[in-house]
């Protein structure tokens, strides 16, 4: 008896794709990057096939994302934001400190051994008068909750036939034949293959140049804390000798819970993730010199590897890199998934315009728009986050603190400068995108039917 041929598509599909079946775009990768890419392209009217790897389930507030207002508009337009099963918390103010002793508070439980001549800090946001609208710099969302919302949206698109999920992985891709080979020997013709996977598969190693990589030999200790005071929707970041510490507001009773992202030497981060919560709280209070009050650990902690990775080319023939396949940046500025959303929305725009003009998806001039814009944005973000991650622990630390202090005083005194800095933070744009129109989805606009 002949054994049945394994299906190419997952359970949601009703039929098996035959050899050389054609699809507009094939998306490969894992996690949220692959899902949002497929959803953006489906929203633009393209037939999409997706092979993604399941992401591990996470506790709701162990890991968070800081999404820009433009990112929220995009997710609302795709009807994803409305399905989040955990509320978000807005950031209305942000304070950055060059060291713990620069934090000014009357509730400090310890005294710093070094009193700064003047504190080095930089603030975003400003007090609003009565009746004025509060400006939101970013939205803190649960990574687990967003993952579930994306999965739900993806399943809906699979059910209505706009996206087909592949159960069999891709093992090869021929750009000249516009053909992807699956592990069961089945071929699929596609105009474009988009990869979002951080670790390049063998077929991508043939098509794309090696990425530039830097391992920080550090880990981000992440989890949820409860403070002894309300967070007031304030995000705080301190450049500690061990690495940057970020405390981000999350929804909670009394508005006292915050998400922690603490960059530490990898061995220490892994050790702290395994010890008693009270010891972690003690170490955190010690590192911050008691300036931020008392902490209680809520739930389990985890460690995320810290790496910098930037692809040399975002487009190689008919292979397009997006998300983690194109860039991995230090999380201190919270720009990782914002970069991915800007990638996916712009690529959907570029391919939509390509089709409107009657050009082939592999048209070099059109794809160059995506590559030039997105690589410049990622390169600038990578350079900025890498520089900040190392600046305050380098020989230039004192000079950096002085520069931050001067800038902070200038911003506090100059209303126009403060408004300009707030506007850029609020727009969700990098410097490279200033003057360029936002992609449709980030403007809150849908594609024409």
Regions found by a protein language model. Give the residues of each.
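Conserved FAD-binding catalytic core of PHBH/FMO-like flavoproteins
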Residues: 75, 187, 192-293, 298-301
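Conserved N-terminal helical subregion
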Residues: 9, 18-21, 84-207, 212-220
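Glycine-rich FAD cofactor-binding loop and adjacent beta-loop-alpha segment at the N-terminus
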Residues: 5-11, 17-26, 30-92, 97, ...
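C-terminal helical "tail/cap" subdomain of flavin- and related membrane-associated enzymes
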Residues: 5-8, 349-449
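Generic enzyme active-site microenvironment
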Residues: 50-51, 193, 322, 329
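Short gly/ser/thr-rich secondary-structure transition/capping motifs
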Residues: 4-11, 175-179, 300-309
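FAD/FMN-dependent oxidoreductases across multiple families
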Residues: 271-354, 361-362
